[in-house]
Each structure stands twice: as C-alpha cells, then as structure tokens.
Regions:
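Short amphipathic alpha-helix that is part of the acyltransferase structural core
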Residues: 2-39, 149-151
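Short, basic/aromatic-enriched C-terminal tail that caps enzymatic domains
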Residues: 3-10, 131-149
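A conserved beta-strand-loop-helix scaffold within acyl/acetyltransferase catalytic domains
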Residues: 42-82
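Conserved acetyl-CoA pyrophosphate-binding loop and the N-cap/start of the following alpha-helix
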Residues: 87-96
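Conserved acyl-CoA
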Residues: 95-110
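Conserved active-site alpha-helix within GNAT-family acetyltransferase domains
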Residues: 108-141
C-alpha cells in the first residue's frame, strides 16, 4: 500500500518517493545522531528499502527525513526523524509529522509508536504520550550495538 504522496508548502516539498532521497545526506545526519551513531551506509540503505520514507526538500536539496516501519493496518513505528540544523525553527518538523500521521493507512492505525530523548514537546502536540503501562512492553537489544553506545 505504498502510494507516493507529495505535499507542497512555499518552496518546500515532502515526498514519499524513495527515488528523490539523498542517501548520503540521510547517512551523514544519522551517523552523527545520538540514536544511530556510527551506523553504516548499508544499514541506512536497508532500513530505507524496508520502510515508508518521507523526504523533506528545499527545491531539490534534501533537508529532512523520517521513516515509518509498518504493516499499514494496525501498527507503525516512526523512526529517524530529523530536519537539518539550518532549517530548524521554520515549522518543518511539525509539517513532517502532520504529513506522516495523515498518510493513508497510518491515519487509521490502532497505535503509532516512537522513541525520543529530547523532542517530547514536539510529539506531544500530535497526541503522543509516555507508555501507559510500560511493564507490558519489552525490548531485545543487540549486544553489538550496545557496545558501540547505541540505544
């Protein structure tokens, strides 16, 4: 059910067309982020190919990204959300989240999950809140990534 969607605002574009994505821009940001520090370009490429991706562009220049891991019916996990630093403060992350949550299939899901260390205020505006019963959730972490400092 991956239908290409595009949203335009002024000179900015959000697109789910993977053909527009700039893999090197995405990798450069993610490999320096707290959540994917040191990730290889092959892992980024593989994660993109197995996700619904949203690229944010100023003209043809990619300035943001997010991806959703989903079954397009019941559950989605939003990951790797970013706007490059020089474009922050323009409302682009809010527009990106609006676009994700309005995407056909995601809009009707039972649950959409994400993890953040520092953007709780942004996500709360979209109805995200801490897990009500965290004791019901479990996670299995790969020891290799823990040794690299990734969480």
């Amino acid at each position: 059910m991956t239908r290409i969607q595009e949203y335009k605002k002024n000179n900015y574009l959000i697109s789910t067309n993977k053909g527009k994505l700039d893999l090197f821009t995405i990798h450069r940001f993610l490999t320096n982020s707290y959540w994917s520090k040191g990730i290889t370009i092959d892992k980024v490429k593989n994660s993109i190919s197995n996700s619904l991706c949203f690229g944010v562009y100023d003209g043809k220049k990619q300035i943001g990204f997010a991806r959703v891991v989903t079954d397009f019916t019941l559950f989605g996990y939003i990951a790797d959300v970013f706007i490059v630093e020089e474009y922050r403060g323009k409302g682009l992350s809010k527009w990106l989240m609006d676009s994700i949550l309005e995407y056909p299939g995601i809009k009707e899901m039972r649950a959409v999950l994400l993890a953040t260390k520092d953007a709780h205020g942004l996500y709360a505006r979209f109805g995200f809140k801490p897990l009500e019963e965290p004791q019901r959730y479990m996670i299995r972490r790969n020891q290799h990534f823990l040794s690299l400092g990734s969480k």
